[in-house]
Amino acid sequence: MKIVNIKGQIELLSGLHIGGGDDTMKIGGIDNGVIKDINTDKPYIPGSSLKGKMRSLLEWSCRVVGYGDGSPFTSKLLKEVPEVDKKDAETLLKLFGDKEGAYGITRISVGDCSLNNSSDGMVLSEAKYENVINRQKGTAEHPRQTERVPAGVKFDFDIRVKVLDEDSEEALVGMVKRGLDLVANDYLGGSGSRGYGRVRFHISE
């Protein structure tokens, strides 16, 4: 077995919102806060958020969405996939795991993404006001504040891929990089349709 590290930075091109639970309600406070490290009170990107977004987009890209009930793709559904798409589908199952167990252990591990040192001293929080437009009255209703990490802030990411003896390193690593490209062309976090979560990945190794 071999472990391949894919490291680099995530640069925010627009404000990012990944929600965190608020333990206390503050009068005049922000309605939707971002998730923050409990020790430093600084924002971070959960590895589960990045991994989940990659997997979702890769399932669309590999054309395996629609074979089940909306749950993640499994080997049980592989027989329904056209032969031309099976190679990608199998790589996807190896990378993210298969609850049926046919493809062994999950190969990918995505760590939480902490702030890059270049973000020291930068403003790490902004409040964006949003509302709903009443179509009949033409007025704004239900105003709320959403916290975002501003554009320009960078986070470090660290992805590790287990390559077993029977695996193709090129296929697994290629699938990871394909997933990162898909996220970069879509969005990360919430409210992507409003322009949130545009990111760029800088791979250093």
Predicted features by range, described:
Residues 1-130, 136-205:
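RNA-binding basic/glycine-rich loop and surface signature characteristic of RAMP-family CRISPR effectors
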